Design a protein with these regions (language model features):
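N-terminal, active-site-proximal structural segment of metallo-dependent hydrolase catalytic domains
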Residues: 1-49, 53-56, 65
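Structured beta-strand-rich core segments of catalytic domains in phosphoester-bond hydrolases
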Residues: 35-38, 44-99
Length: 99
């Protein structure tokens, strides 16, 4: 299994680069940081067309994280870290991937 992490620094502005890299590197699982997009603007269709299922927690400006997988549907198991109920930043997402 090939797992990669990628600080995308704005997913919509770098979507072409991401799609090209996914095709070339063929990672099985990718963790993205700094999406810098709201949930409604996440490019789910483009990623599905590239063969990757995704879960994400978007946020305008600095934050936002996502997990991509070639193994089909991803089951989210946690969103955010315990211990700070006031933390509204999209910095952490956890999932189960069957693969």
């Amino acid at each position: 299994m090939k797992i990669a992490t990628y600080n995308i620094n704005g997913i919509n502005g770098r979507l072409d680069n991401l799609l090209r890299w996914l095709k070339e590197a063929e990672p099985d699982v990718v963790c993205l940081q700094e999406l810098k997009c709201e949930d409604s603007r996440f490019p789910e269709t483009a990623l599905l067309d590239a063969g990757y299922h995704a879960i994400w927690q978007g946020q305008k400006s600095w934050n936002g994280v996502a997990i991509l997988s070639r193994y089909g549907e991803i089951k989210e198991t946690r969103r955010g870290l315990d211990g700070d109920e006031q933390d509204m930043h999209s910095r952490y997402i956890e999932a189960f991937i069957n693969g």
